[in-house]
């Protein structure tokens, strides 16, 4: 995780912080792993005389609207297709600065311990936004759980 934090520090936080007269920057994050990574970055920046303010959000819409409205200097929670989709839907003009890491996608169950135990007709919850929904469907297809017709998944 320290390598991810260092990459983020070098590519996102320091350039923005250098332009801040008060040497502080406010970054919007979602809980895990983004907040945990920013806590490490905060300690690294403090050594160089910068203050990192971490604002935690529990949804994936507000960090972009807060950034567009100016209450954040940056945010750290999304992949590029999600950002591009949000820009189109909300008519925003946000740009990405750095690609940092790939989010894991997991299947969780209280009853099923192995993927092979998943029965035909089982229900699986997936994300409800276009880019992450498409990604989830692709991963389910890649693992042989569903079949998707060619050309149906074009958003991610």
Q: Which role fits each region the language model picked out?
A:
Residues 54-65, 152-156:
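Short helix-initiation/N-cap motifs at beta->coil->alpha
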Residues 68-78, 122, 145:
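Alpha-to-beta junction loops
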Residues 21-32, 52-56, 123-124:
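Short, well-ordered beta-strand elements
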Residues 1-5:
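Positively charged n-region of N-terminal signal peptides that target proteins for export
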Residues 7-16:
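Bacterial N-terminal signal peptides
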């Amino acid at each position: 995780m320290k390598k991810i934090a260092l990459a983020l520090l070098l590519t996102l936080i320091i350039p923005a912080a250098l332009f801040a007269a008060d040497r502080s920057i406010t970054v919007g994050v979602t809980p895990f792993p983004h907040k945990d990574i920013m806590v490490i970055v905060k300690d690294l920046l403090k050594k160089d005389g910068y203050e990192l303010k971490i604002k935690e959000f529990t949804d994936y819409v507000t960090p972009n609207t807060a950034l567009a409205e100016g209450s954040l200097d940056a945010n750290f929670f999304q992949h590029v297709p999600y950002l591009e989709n949000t820009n189109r839907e909300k008519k925003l003009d946000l740009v990405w600065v750095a690609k940092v890491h790939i989010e894991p996608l997991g299947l969780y169950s209280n009853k099923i311990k192995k993927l092979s135990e998943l029965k035909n007709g089982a229900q699986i919850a997936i994300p409800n936004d276009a880019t992450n929904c498409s990604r989830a469907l692709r991963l389910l297809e890649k693992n042989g759980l569903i079949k998707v017709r060619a050309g149906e998944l074009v958003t991610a």
